[in-house]
């Protein structure tokens, strides 16, 4: 005697339906992919970026509620942006800023200060301005990295930022509670920024990573975006650092 089993289709509501997500640095790469993922989950999007033309294309592509072109590392412009935001924001992701590589002993100290200030001050300024804008249970998500955990010539500034951001994140999570604060630490991600940094060496780097990474493929912006949206929707997550590097930190890659 056989028993027929009927499998019914269970509809799932979008996890960010009706929620407002701000992506600072949302015109390309990880930021734009996160915006796409959040849009699929029903979020209303507000994007920022430096390039007006690129930002306009990105905002149109994800049907953003609004967009604002400015330099997020400029405290005055950042403060004005937050002042103009609606009072009810659910999530903010910050992907602005870029890595800096160079030998410490050859580095102009004034430039080194600017690079460090760009990373730390940006996150602190975002947190300060967002404190009265983000709903309880919402989250700030910052982007960091895993590559600087392994010492190497030319990685001095990157390493300093890498090890400091988790502590900054944890302390902000306590200060801003019940708003949640989390950090995503990525390794190599196959973005336009990576292509611009590597130039003709990009394909060699991809091949090297495919051979050495435990996952046997290169991490894509969609991988990071999936993690970002998970952090937004899981309200138990705060003060933590989440690695998404395909195991890069465990191998010589």
Region roles according to the model:
Residues 115-116, 122-125, 139-177, 188-189:
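Catalytic loop of short-chain dehydrogenase/reductase
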Residues 61-76:
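Rossmann-fold cofactor-recognition segment
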Residues 166, 175-190, 194, 237-244:
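Conserved Rossmann-fold SDR core element
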Residues 27-28:
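Conserved glycine-rich cofactor-binding loop
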Residues 103-104, 111-116, 205, 209:
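Substrate-binding pocket helix/loop in short-chain dehydrogenase/reductase
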Residues 93-102, 246-247:
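Conserved NAD(P)H cofactor-binding loop of Rossmann-fold oxidoreductase domains
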Residues 189-212, 253:
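A glycine/serine/threonine-rich, flexible loop-to-helix segment
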Residues 217-244, 249:
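C-terminal substrate-recognition "lid" of short-chain dehydrogenase/reductases
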């Amino acid at each position: 005697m056989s028993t027929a089993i009927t499998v019914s289709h269970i509809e799932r509501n979008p996890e960010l339906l009706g929620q407002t997500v701000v992506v600072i640095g949302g015109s390309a790469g990880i930021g734009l992919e996160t915006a796409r993922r959040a849009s699929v989950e029903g979020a209303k999007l507000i994007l920022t970026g430096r390039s007006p033309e690129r930002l306009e294309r990105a905002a149109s592509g994800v049907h953003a509620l609004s967009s604002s072109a400015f330099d997020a590392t400029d405290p005055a412009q950042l403060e004005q942006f937050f002042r103009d935001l609606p009072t009810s924001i659910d999530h903010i992701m910050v992907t602005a800023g870029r890595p800096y590589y160079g030998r410490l002993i050859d580095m102009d100290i004034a430039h080194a200060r600017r690079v460090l200030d760009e990373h730390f001050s940006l996150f602190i300024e975002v947190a300060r301005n967002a404190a009265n804008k983000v709903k309880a249970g919402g989250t700030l998500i910052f982007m960091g990295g895993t590559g600087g955990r392994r010492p190497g010539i030319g990685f001095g500034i990157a390493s300093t930022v890498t090890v400091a951001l988790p502590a900054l994140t944890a302390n902000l999570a306590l200060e801003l509670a019940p708003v949640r604060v989390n950090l995503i630490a990525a390794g190599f991600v196959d973005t336009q920024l990576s292509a611009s940094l590597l130039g003709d060496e990009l394909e060699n780097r991809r091949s090297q990573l495919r051979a050495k990474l435990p996952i046997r493929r290169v991490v894509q912006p969609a991988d990071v975006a999936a993690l970002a949206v998970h952090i937004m929707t899981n309200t138990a997550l705060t003060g933590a650092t989440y690695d998404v590097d395909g195991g890069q930190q465990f191998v010589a890659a």
